[in-house]
UniProtKB/Swiss-Prot annotation:
Transmembrane segment boundaries: none
Protein's UniProt name: Ribulose bisphosphate carboxylase large chain
Family assignment from sequence similarity: Belongs to the RuBisCO large chain family. Type I subfamily.
Extra remark beyond the main annotation: The basic functional RuBisCO is composed of a large chain homodimer in a 'head-to-tail' conformation. In form I RuBisCO this homodimer is arranged in a barrel-like tetramer with the small subunits forming a tetrameric 'cap' on each end of the 'barrel'.
Assembly: Heterohexadecamer of 8 large chains and 8 small chains.
Family matches, as InterPro entries: RuBisCO, RuBisCo_large_chain_AS, RuBisCO_lsu_C, RuBisCO_lsu_C_sf, RuBisCO_lsu_fd_N, RuBisCO_lsu_N_sf, RuBisCO_lsuI
Chain positions with N-acetylproline modification: P3
Keyword list, A-Z: Acetylation, Calvin cycle, Carbon dioxide fixation, Chloroplast, Lyase, Magnesium, Metal-binding, Methylation, Monooxygenase, Oxidoreductase, Photorespiration, Photosynthesis, Plastid
Lineage of producing organism: Eukaryota, Viridiplantae, Chlorophyta, core chlorophytes, Chlorophyceae
UniProt-annotated binding residues for substrate: N123, T173, K177, R295, H327, S379
Cofactor(s) listed: Mg(2+)
Length: 475
């Protein structure tokens, strides 16, 4: 065995463990208009200085590694490195900090959410010096926004396609979510659409199981759509889930939906992946299909307050990847969602320009450069008594989705749909007349019950149903 010998290094290179602060902590840095900015909630391990920790985050999510390498001399680190340019303690929290990191735009492939996330949240979340790390927000620079196509159509084009204006849209997830045959599934869709809903929906885990293969479902649902349209004179849709085990299978299902002439399909964007989602969004844009996006698996990523990725980031990146609808929580239903936080990322989904507002969790001003907006979908444990709050919270540009709140009606699916449609139109009219739905919403619903027995029956069934749990993720 040859004994190891000490090697003397040249004057321009010295190996060893890096002190990240020397290179990546730059509090004097002036942010460029083209930089991608990130706000991380950071919890260092005991004894690790926060400046070293946030510099490590900037390094490991950009050009850095744990030691000096001789190839650093073959490029310009000053041009390509991420920089921690600000650090602030989190009020009321021990050993927690918000670290602000700026990334040069040239670090990222144009039009690729996949590459953006691979860099910014790829390895750094497993860094040993960190006890916990959460990506709270991203500022996507206008120069980078313009490399994305975004939603296939957007809110205004969707309204034009559907010829529906002046109110929110109504939907319903077909239940039970698994186990129905394709024919019975189509029957449930027809009854809901005939009763007055605009949309029905595949549940996120309905793909192509032995009890209901995807092609059979598509055919029976298309029949239900056309039959209900003929009877009501309204344009109807069903979110046909195109999510599949392969990208080829996904596009095959999208093509089948196009050939059947249905207006909208669906994708589970987190389980399906951003690359698949962007490809599907491009297909929908080219072939005139609306794209409904479900966020299945999001709570695995975003629910913990100290670690993961906040949903406002997932919502922003979905707008970039492409989708016309996105589930956003309800504030009042069974799923997690604080009011101000939810309204913050709803604005980031819909509006063209959103100012920084820390009271709503928005860390950066975001300019979308006229990229089409995404319609928020309120779904999960809502019923007719929630309608005044939903109209007051979300306004008109939202899809309000009642699954059990439609199919659980004691008289059946169609009366359940009637009850929701009557409640929505009553609340919309009351709001337009200047009434305060936050205070008078209950009276609006009770008044509408006098001329809608379907609504009266629904109100009686769900009069005591509440989901009163404290929100985990608070500002």
């Amino acid at each position: 065995m040859v004994p190891q010998t000490e090697t003397k290094t040249g004057a321009g290179f010295k190996a060893g463990v890096k002190d990240y602060r020397l290179t990546y902590y730059t509090p004097d840095y002036v942010v460029s208009e083209t930089d991608i900015l990130a706000a991380f909630r950071m919890t260092p391990q005991p004894g690790v200085p926060p400046e070293e920790c946030d510099a490590a985050v900037a390094a490991e999510s950009s050009t850095g590694t744990w030691t000096t390498v001789w190839t650093d001399g073959l490029t310009s680190l000053d041009k390509y490195k991420g920089r921690c340019y600000d650090l602030e303690p989190v009020p009321g929290e021990e050993n927690q900090y918000i670290a602000y990191v700026a990334y040069p735009i040239d670090l990222f492939e144009e039009g690729s959410v996949t590459n953006l996330f691979t860099s910014i949240v790829g390895n750094v979340f497993g860094f040993k010096a960190l006890r916990a790390l959460r990506l709270e927000d991203l500022r996507i620079s206008p120069a980078y926004v313009k490399t994305f196509v975004g939603p296939p159509h957007g809110i205004q084009v969707e309204r034009d396609k559907l010829n529906k204006y002046g109110r929110g849209l109504l939907g319903c997830t077909i239940k039970p979510k698994l186990g129905l045959s394709a024919k019975n599934y189509g029957r449930a869709v027809y009854e809901c659409l005939r009763g007055g809903l605009d949309f029905t929906k595949d549940d996120e885990n309905v793909n192509s199981q032995p009890f209901m293969r995807w092609r059979d479902r598509f055919l029976f649902v298309a029949e239900a759509i056309y039959k209900s349209q003929a009877e009501t004179g309204e344009i109807k849709g069903h979110y046909l889930n195109a999510t599949a085990g392969t990208a080829e299978g996904m596009l095959q299902r999208a093509q089948c939906a196009k050939e059947l002439g249905v207006p909208i399909i669906m994708h589970d964007y987190l389980t399906g992946g951003f690359t698949a989602n962007t490809s599907l969004a491009h297909y929908c844009r080219d072939h005139g299909l609306l794209l409904h996006i479900h966020r299945a698996m999001h709570a695995v990523i975003d629910r913990q307050r100290n670690h993961g990725i906040h949903f406002r980031v997932l919502a922003k990146t979905l707008r970039m990847s492409g989708g016309d609808h996105l589930h956003s929580g309800t504030v009042v239903g069974k799923l997690e969602g604080e009011r101000e936080v939810t309204l913050g990322f709803v604005d980031l989904m819909r509006d063209n320009f959103v100012e920084k507002d820390r009271s709503r969790g928005i860390y950066f001003t975001q300019d979308w450069c006229s990229m089409p907006g995404v319609m928020p979908v309120a779904s999960g444990g809502i019923h007719v008594w929630h309608m005044p709050a939903l109209v007051e919270i979300f306004g008109d540009d939202a899809c309000l989705q009642f699954g059990g709140g439609t199919l659980g009606h004691p008289w059946g699916n169609a009366p359940g749909a009637v009850a929701n449609r009557v409640a929505l139109e009553a609340c919309t009219q009351a709001r337009n007349e200047g009434r305060d739905l936050a205070r008078e919403g209950g009276n609006v619903i009770r008044s509408a019950c006098k001329w809608s027995p379907e609504l009266a029956a629904a109100c009686e069934v769900w009069k005591e149903i509440k989901f009163e749990f404290d929100t985990i993720d608070k500002l």
